[in-house]
Amino acid sequence: EFMSSNTKKDLVIVTGYQESKLYHILNNKYHFENDQRVKFVGTIYDDALLKSVRKNAFAYLHGHEVGGTNPSLLEALGSTSLNLLLNVGFNQEVGLDSCIYWGKEKNNLKHLIEHVETFDQDYIDTLGKAAKDRIKNAYSWTKIVSDYESLFLRKKDL
């Protein structure tokens, strides 16, 4: 759906794709090599560089729909102001109201990509602050350790 959108922005995909059969299957089907906006940049192992890519991205697009707390989503919330998430329970639980959600209905993501380009910077900054607050309040090591201490102390008293 990105390729059918009118956005002038690039879609930067950070992944090890070169030897992937799936990459070649999808490329044969969608011909994304013909869209100059689609950029596969490979895997980035340099943490500082990856943080810089996330921080300077216009938005983070998260299409995972299988359960649990996804580390890449947590990292994005901590560094990217505009986070576009597939609308499933796991993602909603993590992002709450700090993210914008899209569905799997035809053209839903396409329209969202075009719509978010109309957001003013103050709104994007507000979402970014909410995302960073969400990470700090629910997923920081301080919070996690405190929750485990409480759990273990309650178990000890039983």
What are these regions (language model features)?
Residues 1-9:
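Short hydrophobic signal-anchor/transmembrane segments that target glycosyltransferases
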Residues 70-73:
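Short glycine/serine-rich donor-binding loops of glycosyltransferases
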Residues 88-101:
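Short acidic/histidine- and often glycine-rich active-site loop of Leloir-type glycosyltransferases
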Residues 99-107, 115-121:
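Conserved acidic donor-binding segment of nucleotide-sugar-dependent glycosyltransferases
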Residues 10-25, 39-43:
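Glycosyltransferase donor-sugar binding loop
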Residues 52-68, 81:
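Acidic donor-binding loop of glycosyltransferase active sites
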